[in-house]
Each structure stands twice: as structure tokens, then as C-alpha cells.
Design a protein with these regions (language model features):
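Helix-rich terminal scaffold detector
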Residues: 1-63, 158
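Flexible, active-site-adjacent loop/turn segments at secondary-structure boundaries
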Residues: 2-4, 40, 72, 86, ...
Length: 158
């Protein structure tokens, strides 16, 4: 199985979700199924059906997270020393060359990506354009509105 890069923070979030699923959600679902069974006829028992559906979701999510964590290559950006080069986990300050607008992104794994928080997926067009570049370089990105050029103002490993 191929390794999946994930930041330390992303791995901690997945572990916290897994813990909640195993210690809160799973016991709740088991109890809900037990209570629904106690009501008698299961063939027309909506509570039982809903609890079984929830159980399927919870167990599926537990397996999914377990799989991701077992294949994860956890990277702590604060321990990186890439000499100003953009790598997975780095935080990059950019200036859009046409408008002068400044943005800051951290390059993260698929499960961590949230553009509103400035977290971009390693396989996104902007991350692919930035990887390997250094401070002062220009990255050209194919955006929905056309090509955009960004100057890399700073690269941080935080």
C-alpha cells in the first residue's frame, strides 16, 4: 500500500475522530440497536433501521480512518529544513503578480484540505505548481479563470 502524506496536525485530527467514533458513537449505536430490538417486531421498526444504518456508517468510517492512519506518512512541518524550497507541509506566502493580492497557503494532505483555512491539497493545481519552487520564484497556475502567476514571497515550515 502506498504511503499517504499527512501533517502532524492532520493525523491528530483523524486520531481524535477515531477515538470519538470508538468511544462515543459506537457504544451509542449499540445501545440504540438494543433499545430498538426491545420494541419487538424488527420488520417495521424505523428506529432499528436507522440505528443499523448509523452503525454501518460508524463502522465504515472507523475502517476508513484506520486504513488512512496505517498508510500515513506523518510529516511535522516544524521539523522540515528544505532550505526555502516548497515541500509538503510548508506554508507559502504568495503575491498574485497581476493584482498584487497576497495569499498564504499550507500544502497538506487530501483529508486536511480546506481552502477557507488556507489549507490546499497536495494534488491541487496550485500545490503542484508550487512544489519544488523557492522564495523569489514564480509559479504559474491554471485557475478556473485562466492562468495566474504568483511570486513566492516566503516559505515557512511551521
Amino acid at each position: 500500500m502506498a504511503t499517504i502524506p499527512i501533517t502532524k496536525r492532520g493525523a491528530e485530527k483523524l486520531k481524535a475522530e477515531l477515538h470519538k467514533l470508538k468511544t462515543v458513537e459506537r457504544p451509542w449505536v449499540i445501545n440504540a440497536i438494543s433499545e430498538a430490538r426491545a420494541q419487538g417486531d424488527l420488520s417495521e421498526n424505523a428506529e432499528y433501521d436507522a440505528a443499523k444504518d448509523r452503525q454501518g456508517f460508524v463502522e465504515g468510517r472507523i475502517q476508513e480512518i484506520d486504513g488512512k492512519l496505517s498508510a500515513a506518512q506523518v510529516i511535522d512541518p516544524s521539523e522540515l529544513d528544505a532550505g526555502g524550497r516548497v515541500v509538503f507541509g510548508s506554508t507559502v506566502e504568495l503575491e498574485e503578480e497581476e493584482t498584487g493580492e497576497r495569499v498564504k497557503y499550507q500544502i497538506v494532505g487530501e483529508d486536511e484540505a480546506d481552502l477557507k483555512l488556507g489549507l490546499v491539497n497536495i494534488s491541487s493545481p496550485i500545490a503542484r505548481a508550487l512544489i519544488g519552487k523557492e522564495e523569489g520564484d514564480t509559479a504559474v497556475v491554471q485557475a478556473p479563470g485562466g492562468l495566474k502567476s504568483y511570486e513566492i514571497v516566503a516559505v515557512h515550515y511551521i
